[in-house]
Amino acid sequence: MKFKLKTTSGTARRGEMTFSRPQGEFTVQTPAFMPVGTYGTVKGMTPEEVRATGAEILLGNTFHLWLRPGQEVMRKHGDLHDFMQWHRPILTDSGGFQVFSLGKLRKITEEGVKFQNPINGERIFLSPEKSMEIQYDLGSDIVMIFDECTPYPATFDYAKKSMEMSLRWAQRSRDRFDELGNKNALFGIVQGGTFEELRKVSAEGLVDIGFDGYAVGGLAVGEPKEEMHRILEFTTPLLPADKPRYLMGVGKPEDLVEGVRRGIDMFDCVMPTRNARNGHLFVTDGIVKIRNAKYRDDTSALDPHCDCYTCRHYTKSYLYHLDKCGEILGARLNTIHNLRYYQRLMEEIRQAIEEDRFDDFVVEFYTRMGKEVPPLQKP
């Protein structure tokens, strides 16, 4: 992977990542949003439909794909690209967050994490080395190191020990990645909870090891929005300007805008797809909750500013009807729209940075939402 920083507008960055794959070179424009394909599919969507929304890179889930279908099945197909028939770039998370989410079902040691398989109950073990091996078999274009996602709230002492172990795991991830001869990209993950001192140690330690990109992890795990913004604003300047920066698991449209304001290049989140299945649809001036009875006979398009398949062909009344009847098509049309909304938002952001009017875009974005612009700590 090659990353090129093309221009900036304040602290907002406009760049591109280039990946060499057997099918040729693929470019991902940044800032980028990655739809989540947990089990090797963006729920309810074909790869062609996902691509039609504007997506250039997807996220796959190492933990879930390891448990099912497993490495052997993946190897028989070639890799995850062949398995799911998406031949563009894929980033896979390391499994660290999913293990963190298991709570009492897991036990963390220096060697790795022992936990109960949520599918069949057997005890299994995941280590930095094993995570690198799974992601190698997945053929991930961007591999994430194995880390512990520090919970919120956490004491300084817990966050410090967790961050220090994640740094040791980062080195072990780097070593095993290199031993495997993996020629793809490996990203480090900054941890340290809500403590700036720990974030600094983590970032500097990761830069010393050396990675192709750097993620900010351990955010959007329950902390107040102001805390997330504070830590993000503190952390991103510590990361190399010539490497992509990734905010993991975030988030709402406002979170993407705030991340870009603070120098982030990459995002992923289940929100557009999960919310679509629950009738919660993102539009230019806010949210449409399509299950609301007022849409029963509303013959207008979902969003007159949107060019997606759903908005070009169907009314709010039809989407309301499909949802009420529990029709699968409703979830699919909602998903197409939400994913296109996110990609249109990123397109608008990229254009605003190119034209050096990102601050104006931020004001416009919040104005059409009827919201105030959140302050930066360092305007």
Swiss-Prot record:
Residues the record lists as binding substrate: 93-97, 147, 191, 218
InterPro entries tied to this protein: ArchSynthase1/Queuine_TRR (IPR050076), TGT (IPR004803), TGT-like_sf (IPR036511), tRNA_ribo_trans-like (IPR002616)
Its biological purpose: Catalyzes the base-exchange of a guanine (G) residue with the queuine precursor 7-aminomethyl-7-deazaguanine (PreQ1) at position 34 (anticodon wobble position) in tRNAs with GU(N) anticodons (tRNA-Asp, -Asn, -His and -Tyr). Catalysis occurs through a double-displacement mechanism. The nucleophile active site attacks the C1' of nucleotide 34 to detach the guanine base from the RNA, forming a covalent enzyme-RNA intermediate. The proton acceptor active site deprotonates the incoming PreQ1, allowing a nucleophilic attack on the C1' of the ribose to form the product.
UniProt xrefs under HAMAP family: Q_tRNA_Tgt
Family the entry assigns: Belongs to the queuine tRNA-ribosyltransferase family.
Alphabetized PANTHER family for the sequence: QUEUINE TRNA-RIBOSYLTRANSFERASE (PTHR46499:SF1)
Protein name as it appears in the record: Queuine tRNA-ribosyltransferase
Native source organism of the sequence: Actinobacillus succinogenes (strain ATCC 55618 / DSM 22257 / CCUG 43843 / 130Z)
